């Protein structure tokens, strides 16, 4: 297979390496021999990478190295265990990273949930109770002209569940100057979410609801996952 970005040096440290990707140097973390994410990241930095992917930031040491690498010009991608995109900021600070370092290095945080997809073989229309329909239409302009809403009935193709496959719903936080200032001043998650809401940035629930309105998933699944 041809490399995805032939002119760039892309290096990862993963635990484990699940897929081999052409053109990317992939390092498997092995904590039992001392090759954890932090040590793997140190080794990567000696290879003059353009892009670094760290499988997961689990501790201060890994977070500190990753953030300092990003401040020297490398693009750094990683994952954190948080409930939403704003929670990534709090998680890094709680690990011990100085807020000013988080604000100066973080460019974007993206939260993801998986929704069950309605089975296409038993997809059927159903009626939403009037008050709930009015609430949805008042909150989501996309629903105002929609007259058909769907769910899965259950069939042999989906083992009677009404669902077949999954789809991702995302919440993306693009860090602007206002958010950087809020992070540096250690403003609360609630303050940041309030600012994003005023900007019209949609959260996980909003984006999941759009998947329901457009017929991809069920209302029950929206409430379950978000």
Label each residue range with its predicted role.
Residues 1-226:
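Short, flexible helix-loop junctions that flank or precede catalytic/ligand sites
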